[in-house]
Amino acid sequence: MAKRPNILKLATKISLESMTYMGITYDDPEYKILEPIIDDDMCAIMMHVRLETNRTVEEVAKRARKSVEFTQEQLDKLCKTGAVRYRYVDGKRCYFYPIWVPGIMEGILANREQCDKYPVLGESFEAYTRRRPEMLAPMLDSGKTGMFFMRVMPVMSAIENDSHAASYDEVRTLIENATAISVGPCSCRRARRLMGEGCGHLEEDMCMYLNDNARCFSEQGYHRLVTKEEAYEILQRAEDNGLVHEINQTPGFEDTNAICNCCGCSCFALRIAELFRTPRAIRSNYIARVDKEKCVACGQCVENCQTNALKLGQKRCTTDPHISDTYDTDASVPFHRSSYNPEYRTNRSDVMPSGTAPCKAECPAHIPVQGYIKLASLGRYTEALELIKKENPFPAVCGRICNKRCEDACTRGSIDDPIAIDDIKKFIAEKDLEAGTRFVPKMLNQIGRPYTEKIAVIGAGPAGLSCAYYLAVKGYPVTVFEKESVPGGMLTLGIPSFRLEKNVVNAEIDVLKELGVEFRFGVEVGKNMTLDALRADGYKAIYLAVGASKGTPAGCPGDDLKGVFTGVEFLRAVNLGKRPTIGKQVAVIGGGNVAIDVARAAVRRGADVTLLYRRGREEMPAAGEEVAEAEAEGVKFRFLCAPVEILGEKGKATAIKVETMTLGEPDEKGRRKPVGTGEFETLAVSAVISAIGQQIDLCGIDAGSKLRLGKRGTVLVDPATYQTDEPDVFAGGDLVTGPKFAIDAIAAGKEAAVSIHRFVHPGQSQLIGRDHRDYKSLDPATVAVPIESFDNTPRQHAHDGSAEEAKKTFHDLRGVFTEEQMKKETERCLGCGAVVLNEDQCIGCGICTTKCKFDAIRLEKVNDTHGREYFRTLLTVAGNTPAAIGRLVRKTRGR
């Protein structure tokens, strides 16, 4: 492309007038952002427009020595590009241009059509805001607050009762004094999208212009005018989404012309705090303060902190002198590039190196256990349910079937018994079983209206339902395709009702229906519908969650005889109300939870059940309490024996031959390998049920696709995003991991929803700005519990039906805590986690205060400065003389 000296001259003129001239070449962003959009005639006219100086068309025409008609035509085109603006003075348009940033470049990025045509515009905006502010960074870190051209404003709710708050601390002042307000795209997010580096926060309807700016950009068609009431709604929606309010303070506070709603993962102004580590440059007059005693480490403030100034840590004292939950920050350390954080968009962490509450860290879904326990203790049950559902849409289901890794890791368990976390959750989730009391979340997204991109979910098991739930909450139209006649997958067809009543599953699925999720049953994608057919029907992304719903045969001679079932096959029949013929003498093969479920279900069908397991009792993967329940109901166990052959007469199973085993050397998983002894025994049976594993049946979904399969038939995906080799196809749950627990599938479904949201909006990265949810538990052995305040209350137990009663019914006879029991159990929680604040990194936005339900974090006013006009700011940070700016430029270049 030919170099254009006239455009270089124009860029130089703007920079000189802005006092930011550092020498401009054809490779610099100031040139590259103007070159594609300004032709020679436009350039000739713009040379006679001046920085922040009002000139009518007649004045510009006179200076350019062109006709008024020609000049007006070029000015109109320049305004359309966003490079030139106008304001009305005495009813007449007066033309000017602002500084580069915030100013010209944001204006250029407001024009979507030209941006999509010339992606270099976004690249230039990014480059300028990265390279040019760097020369000011050393001065901006001098301890002065809010000295940069953009400045954070605290959320109104955080300071509304603060007697020290001034009018220039309140964004309300700007809204109320505005003569016009418009809303339009976020230029930073648009630039990121053009570069393929979007963070998942979308650009539309987020940033507001005020007064003359609002009139100019709405008349150009890039913004839309809004009322003050609508402006407050936009601000509230931004806060709900965790976005920070910032203002352009270059005209001075009273004449502020823009309010941005920013995220730390895309905003070029917040980058000052994160990349250069100079948060004071943009900080409001406030800073956050954490009340550690009130904090319950729910993590809501951490996840929404745009500068990663908050992390989860420990509340209790530690016996290890090497553990410290504090930040080592020193403002006196000289500023240097070595202190930059160039990977800030991908390296944020949620947890201090010493770890945090194990209940949250070890849960696959990272549910804020400590938080909902505290809410329950206060009787705030709906809020507790809401908090749980931020990570798990099925608390009533999981309160009955979860494998309770939170309890296994509970710090209290290192003292006596762990907190009965699942029973507390089960008590809270009783509200979900009734339509009048269940919690149905409101749609939450940036645009305040549903998205139009249709999403298909294949499989109505826990992974598919979780993905559908979180996509629906975000406002997407979701259709779930299920080959069975009922939803729930293994929750409905693979777990017997005495462990999970179907009305519980259906009640929580009803929430999805209220959210607008559509279900289509009897549709087997891969057989009567293909992936291409879904695409042709307008689905922009597909989530595969068909699970591992096929049983594994016994794998020995005779496993094809009548009366031989797989565990999955048997449980499916039972859950559909059928009565498979099993007779009175049933052998169940396996040692996992499915084998226990099968054995207990067979007992309820009147059978005498013997469970055969090739290892010892200690090696059984089944939950200990379920093994005990099975024993109490009459299931007999034969350990260290493996099936060799199923014998039969007239095509029907009548006996099973087993070999006595011994345990040899550990296998690749560390489990001692069973080795045959050569001793055999034959047991009479009327049926054999093999519950030794589950298999994946894709039903031909992968035919003709780029899907890659693993050794066990699992679908291979990116481990962080769940994206397959078909870019619009994502997968999760047992289909990816092989058989695991419901909570694992639920967690995977939520992560896939994050990925799908990013995928259906072109230009969004799957990894940039993503919370990688890398949690670490504190070491319970180092927690110091004060004996004088230790609550010795024993663990509470719900009243369950007796084993004799239980084995006669398929109803779940396990009890639910009384409210008194629940309150006693919540008091046993040690509350070992708390948030840790890095005050030096805090920007005083107050978003954290809007997320905390425990009054554990607030804003405190620590400064009393307000916005100052651009040139005063520039001179102040540079040393109060134009010559100092030159010295600063030379110093910056030399570093």
Regions found by a protein language model. Give the residues of each.
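A conserved FAD-binding loop/helix module that cradles the flavin
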Residues: 598, 735-760
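Ferredoxin-like iron-sulfur electron-transfer modules
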Residues: 36, 66, 95, 246-259, ...
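FAD-site-proximal beta/loop scaffold in flavoenzymes
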Residues: 560-585, 666-739
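Flanking helices and flexible, charged tails adjoining ferredoxin-like Fe-S electron-transfer domains
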Residues: 307-358, 373, 416-421, 425-454, ...
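Beta1-alpha1 glycine-rich phosphate/pyrophosphate-binding loop at the start
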Residues: 367-377, 418-422, 457-525, 552-555, ...
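A short, conserved structural fragment
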Residues: 79-90, 310-311, 857
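Glycine-rich dinucleotide-binding loop and its adjacent helix/turn
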Residues: 428-449, 507-527, 551-605, 709-725
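Short, amphipathic alpha-helical interaction segments positioned at domain boundaries
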Residues: 92-131, 879
